[in-house]
Amino acid sequence: MYSAPSTCTCLCLHFLLLCFQVQVLAAEENVDFRIHVENQTRARDDVSRKQLRLYQLYSRTSGKHIQVLGRRISARGEDGDKYAQLLVETDTFGSQVRIKGKETEFYLCMNRKGKLVGKPDGTSKECVFIEKVLENNYTALMSAKYSGWYVGFTKKGRPRKGPKTRENQQDVHFMKRYPKGQAELQKPFKYTTVTKRSRRIRPTHPG
């Protein structure tokens, strides 16, 4: 003989169903948030305040600095070389940057063939890079338009094509360095301690 399920059993089933629905909703929200962050990382932000910094990018492979020589790019610059001084503009909260040679005013860009070139106009997405800070404290620059393609150089300072680069290659590892004479101007703010002034006691004179 078939017996109807008890009230307790029904309540348990409803509770389990409710828990399952909550987990599904939470998973969807996590996925949506992750997608939102990825989209914001790749999308340019014209609302946020842009930051402009001046520094050099030292190539781990060539032992020299990136140079923007007009339309030609290399990594053969000595410390303090005028063509190695780069104006780096942070474009979004997702670490997107545009890099311009201070001397030539040409932008570092990567074309559709993966070749590094200099361009006088940096508004194209080919001139935007995603800055990645690696575990070894080096920095890698991935193209915002061509995902997986990185700025990289050979030991002789020649540019590597984007399709031949990977994040774990030393060819794409760089270190930020201030130009000669600029480090002193970039010192962090320091607090100074002020000692409390003691009250001066006037000597008493006998009457």
Curated annotation (Swiss-Prot):
Disulfide bonds join 109-127. Its main location: secreted. Residues 1-27 form the signal peptide. Glycans are attached at residues 39, 137. GO terms for biological process: fibroblast growth factor receptor signaling pathway; neurogenesis; positive regulation of cell population proliferation; positive regulation of MAPK cascade; regulation of cell migration. PROSITE patterns: HBGF_FGF (PS00247). GO terms for cellular component: cytoplasm; extracellular space. Keywords: Disulfide bond, Glycoprotein, Growth factor, Secreted, Signal. It is found in: Secreted. InterPro entries: Fibroblast_GF_fam, IL1/FGF. One of its GO terms (molecular function) is growth factor activity. Belongs to the heparin-binding growth factors family. Interacts with FGFR3 and FGFR4. Plays an important role in the regulation of cell proliferation, cell differentiation and cell migration. Required for normal ossification and bone development. Stimulates hepatic and intestinal proliferation. This is Fibroblast growth factor 18.
